[in-house]
Amino acid sequence: MTKILGSDPVKRGMAQMQKGGVIMDVVNAEQARIAEAAGAVAVMALERVPSDIRAAGGVARMANTTIVREVMEAVSIPVMAKARIGHIVEARVLEAMGVDYIDESEVLTPADEEFHLLKSDYTVPFVCGCRDLGEALRRIGEGASMLRTKGEPGTGNVVEAVRHLRKVNAQLRKVINMSHDELMTEAKYLGAPFELLLQIKTLGKLPVVNFAAGGIATPADAALMMELGADGVFVGSGIFKSENPEKFAKAIVQATTHYQDYDLIARLSADLGEPMRGVEISELAVQDRMQERGW
């Protein structure tokens, strides 16, 4: 069967090629080159990393197209970029620019509080965040080709990413072990398409890859998420807000690849300098929690 450009198999296949790797947020060409040299499988081009977006407040939008273009020209690995939830034109602009992936991201200020993008209408593949299986399947139903935990971006605190990944995986196990006649009721409970639950039961897993994101700040954090079953990791502020970005980037890539080699992770964690400053989640007001954006 001929594979059609923009079809689900093609778009999901692109995400499969990133499996086991690290995707790093970058704000300029120099950072993109550091990420590529460290072994990142892709970079996410944006104007400000999540911790700076959080600190600045106000409205966070799609990155200036000049930044996205400079990053695309600087590296040979895939380049992703963020669009606001529901912002059709930002997504179309990024698609026209030729980015490899679009992240419909809660890190940016949502443009639409009711509707997410219909991602199946685009040729470019999308990645979306999720906190549970219901969110995951709603995004896949809209056409997402890749998932990531929402976590709590820009905090350097991995606890929410752990919570979200564990919840998705627990709900997956529940669905896989259900009888077929129970799936429709579970679909109603989750607010998710029945056909996707049936697909999960048949496959024994999600139909797309699910990376960990939101608060990953150290090599041990990255290894933890892989240990818990993530297909790879996104690192936002954790690298370029650390004391030594080059060393942190290389160490996180190695820890992700060799996540059960604890002696290696111990060596990688030595003499790295200070990681990014962390934020306690309980100190954040609900309206300041990016994970609450979208549904």
Swiss-Prot record:
CDD domains listed in its UniProt record: pdxS
Binding site for D-glyceraldehyde 3-phosphate: R166
Residues that hold D-ribose 5-phosphate according to the record: D25, G154, G215, G236, S237
One of the protein's GO biological processes: pyridoxal phosphate biosynthetic process
Pathway connected to this protein: Cofactor biosynthesis; pyridoxal 5'-phosphate biosynthesis
Matches recorded under PROSITE patterns: PDXS_SNZ_1, PDXS_SNZ_2
Catalytic residues of the enzyme: K82 (schiff-base intermediate with d-ribose 5-phosphate)
EC assignment: 4.3.3.6
Reactions that this protein is recorded to catalyse: aldehydo-D-ribose 5-phosphate + D-glyceraldehyde 3-phosphate + L-glutamine = pyridoxal 5'-phosphate + L-glutamate + phosphate + 3 H2O + H(+)
Pfam families, alphabetized: SOR_SNZ (PF01680)
Recorded GO MF terms: pyridoxal 5'-phosphate synthase (glutamine hydrolysing) activity
Keywords: Lyase, Pyridoxal phosphate, Schiff base
Cited InterPro entries: Aldolase_TIM (IPR013785), PdxS/SNZ (IPR001852), PdxS/SNZ_N (IPR033755), RibuloseP-bd_barrel (IPR011060)
Biological role: Catalyzes the formation of pyridoxal 5'-phosphate from ribose 5-phosphate (RBP), glyceraldehyde 3-phosphate (G3P) and ammonia. The ammonia is provided by the PdxT subunit. Can also use ribulose 5-phosphate and dihydroxyacetone phosphate as substrates, resulting from enzyme-catalyzed isomerization of RBP and G3P, respectively.
Subunit details: In the presence of PdxT, forms a dodecamer of heterodimers.
Protein family (similarity comment): Belongs to the PdxS/SNZ family.
Protein name: Pyridoxal 5'-phosphate synthase subunit PdxS
Annotated source species: Actinobacillus pleuropneumoniae serotype 7 (strain AP76)
Gene expressing this chain: pdxS
